[in-house]
A protein has these predicted regions:
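Solvent-exposed interaction patches of small proteins and small membrane subunits
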Residues: 1-117
Length: 117
């Protein structure tokens, strides 16, 4: 993978987080559970996040251990393979608590990569 390819994957993750945040803005756990279309859109973007994570080189993942790379991949596996049993509280916690801090962390990786070129 060329150096720019993994940066594109980080950008894909950021775009998917942004979409999830847009889709769920103003929502609650209860309203999310009642809105299957939004759940499907969120699950699709969590899948993209997990898949994109697989394409970030191990060296980059090792350099940034505070980012939950394994959890991002694992969530993809859950929503793809256990899609009928996705836990709404876990999905909601991911949306509300886990994704927001990733935005600045991932932007920091892109800034570091730009600086190191």
């Amino acid at each position: 993978m060329s150096p720019s390819d993994w940066r594109m994957r980080i950008q894909d993750i950021l775009e998917s987080i942004q979409k999830i945040q847009e889709y769920t803005e103003g929502a609650s756990l209860e309203s999310l559970q009642a809105d299957r279309k939004t759940v499907d859109a969120v699950v699709r973007n969590l899948t993209i996040i997990g898949e994109a994570t697989r394409h970030v080189p191990v060296e980059i993942q090792t350099r940034y251990p505070a980012i939950p790379w394994d959890d991002m991949r694992d969530m993809r596996n859950v929503v793809v393979h256990e899609y009928l049993r996705v836990s709404y509280p876990i999905l909601w916690r991911t949306i509300q608590s886990n994704l927001p801090p990733l935005v600045e962390q991932l932007k920091g990786i892109l800034r570091d990569a730009e600086r190191d070129q």
